[in-house]
């Protein structure tokens, strides 16, 4: 940069860059004591003293006298705009000092704001990636099994919290992915800003750093942290997810509705049955059976227990033709008690009159113990089963169920002491006439019948009759 030229003066200012060096040369350069920058052209206001720069060996061998001055532009830059200063020497070399243009400086306060913003974006990106793993790693069947069978109340509550989010699974998924993409793009832009501000690299360098940060914070850390405590973290961050859904709803909600139309909505209704195929119990059973342990039997019981939810009363009932039933007019005689005892009957269904469709109640064999003598022998009496039902009113506690009713709907009645459930089936009739029964008794269901569906055959009074 030649500031001293005999008989010449250029009115345009020199535009200074960070690494520019001012060179002075000429016959009288050796008389220059120092150089400085002034805010006015008269060189009366010294704002920055220049430091003489040591010459390279090549420049020392040049003919003539040469002096170099180096300017630290960063010390003179201002974020308010371009600054103009005048180069001056002592003593002056020309009547009019030469103007230098200092480019606009960078606002460091913005950097102090951008750094916390970068940390926030990294944290949010990791959170969104982790939530995607935590919430979507549990299937609807997994959550329902935890709600219904887990003994830990806290785990049940956490499963309920996550199930609340899964009712809008597409909306939640789009929200999480949108938030993750937004944070990742922001991280890349911020890294590019820092690279330009500090001047530490080009496009490839910025991409490498951004890729490394995203790999660590959005892939590795979420996989290590969120997968170990997925249900607990997803439950605790449910309100954060809901808040994010509200903020991003103008974009994420229409996309979620579009996914519902194209792919369908996930069935997260609490009343929906478990999808047994999704549980893959058969695969687990086959894998563990090769180990020769008891896992096969345990998984078989689990599978039968779950399938019991799908069965109807007609699937587990004992058909009425195989049930020992007695008329209300049957006298309680010695032979009757002996016959009932030998056949292994513990519960005696009593019907009204001559029709087996009108069940009056169910007597327990223990009720007959009142008529036994001290030696266990029955005595002939004039009592009938109908009379005993009238006396023992509590033994009339039984329930009627339709043959199409699911087993789980009347299991609680059997557990609470109901001796048996009478299964009825409605007849197909054109019109209902007076005194015409529109239903028929087709079987009975006891608690033992339900247990047999789970554990297999149990030796009970039905098997005693077959023996």
From Swiss-Prot:
Keyword Disulfide bond: no
Extracellular compartment residues: 1-110, 192-196, 260-467
Gene Ontology MF terms: transmembrane transporter activity
Domain spans labelled CNNM transmembrane: 107-293
Transmembrane segments: 111-131, 171-191, 197-217, 239-259
Disrupted gene: phenotype observed: No visible phenotype. Quintuple knockout with cnnm-1, cnnm-2, cnnm-3 and cnnm-5 results in a reduced lifespan and 100% sterility.
GO cellular component: plasma membrane
Superkingdom of this protein's organism: Eukaryota
Membrane topology: Multi-pass membrane protein
Cytoplasmic-facing ranges: 132-170, 218-238
Keywords assigned: CBS domain, Cell membrane, Glycoprotein, Ion transport, Membrane, Repeat, Transmembrane, Transmembrane helix, Transport
Pfam families associated with the record: CNNM (PF01595)
Keyword Ion transport: yes
UniProt cross-references to InterPro entries, sorted A to Z: ACDP, CBS_dom_sf, CNNM, Ion_transp-like_CBS
Occurrences of domain CBS (ranges): 317-381, 394-461
Free-text function comment from the UniProt entry: Probable metal transporter. Probably acts redundantly with the other metal transport proteins cnnm-1, cnnm-2, cnnm-3 and cnnm-5 to regulate Mg(2+) homeostasis.
The name this protein goes by in its record: Metal transporter cnnm-4
Species of the source: Caenorhabditis elegans
């Amino acid at each position: 940069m030649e500031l001293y030229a005999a008989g010449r003066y250029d009115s345009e200012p020199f535009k200074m860059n960070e690494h520019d060096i001012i060179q002075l040369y000429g016959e009288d350069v050796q008389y220059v004591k120092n150089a400085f920058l002034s805010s006015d052209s008269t060189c009366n206001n010294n704002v920055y003293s220049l430091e003489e720069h040591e010459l390279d060996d090549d420049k020392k061998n040049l003919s003539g006298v040469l002096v170099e001055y180096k300017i630290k532009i960063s010390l003179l830059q201002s974020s308010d705009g371009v600054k103009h200063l005048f180069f001056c020497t002592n003593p002056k070399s020309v009547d009019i000092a030469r103007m230098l243009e200092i480019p606009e400086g960078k606002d460091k306060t913005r950097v102090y704001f951008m750094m916390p913003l970068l940390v926030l974006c990294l944290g949010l990106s990791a959170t969104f990636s982790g939530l995607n793993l935590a919430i979507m790693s549990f299937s609807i069947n997994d959550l329902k099994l935890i709600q219904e069978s887990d003994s830990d109340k806290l785990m049940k509550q956490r499963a309920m919290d996550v199930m609340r989010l899964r009712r809008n699974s597409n909306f939640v998924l789009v929200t999480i992915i949108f938030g993750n993409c937004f944070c990742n793009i922001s991280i890349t832009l911020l890294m590019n800003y820092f690279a330009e501000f500090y001047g530490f690299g080009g496009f490839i360098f910025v991409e490498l750093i951004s890729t490394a940060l995203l790999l660590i914070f959005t892939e590795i850390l979420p996989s290590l942290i969120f997968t170990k405590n997925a249900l607990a973290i997803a439950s605790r961050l449910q309100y954060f997810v809901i808040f994010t859904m509200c903020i991003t709803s103008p974009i994420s909600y229409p996309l979620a509705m579009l996914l519902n139309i194209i792919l369908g909505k996930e069935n997260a209704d609490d009343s929906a049955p478990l999808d047994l195929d999704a549980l893959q119990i058969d695969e687990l059973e086959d894998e563990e059976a090769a180990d020769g342990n008891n896992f096969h039997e345990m998984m078989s019981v689990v599978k039968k227990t779950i399938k019991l939810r799908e069965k109807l009363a007609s699937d587990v009932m004992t058909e009425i033709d195989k049930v020992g039933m007695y008329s209300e007019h049957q006298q309680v005689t010695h032979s009757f008690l002996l016959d009932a005892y030998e056949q292994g009957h513990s519960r005696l269904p009593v019907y009204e009159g001559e029709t087996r469709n009108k069940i009056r109640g169910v007597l327990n064999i223990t009720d007959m113990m009142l008529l036994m003598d001290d030696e266990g022998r029955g005595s002939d009496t004039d009592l009938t089963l109908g009379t005993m039902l009238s006396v023992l009113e509590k033994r009339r506690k039984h329930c009627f169920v339709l043959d199409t009713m699911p087993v789980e709907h009347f299991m609680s009645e059997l557990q609470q002491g109901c001796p048996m459930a009478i299964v009825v089936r409605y007849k197909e009739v054109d019109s209902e006439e007076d005194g015409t029964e529109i239903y028929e008794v087709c079987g009975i269901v006891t608690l033992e019948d339900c247990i047999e569906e789970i554990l297999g055959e149990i030796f009970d009074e039905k098997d005693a009759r077959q023996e």
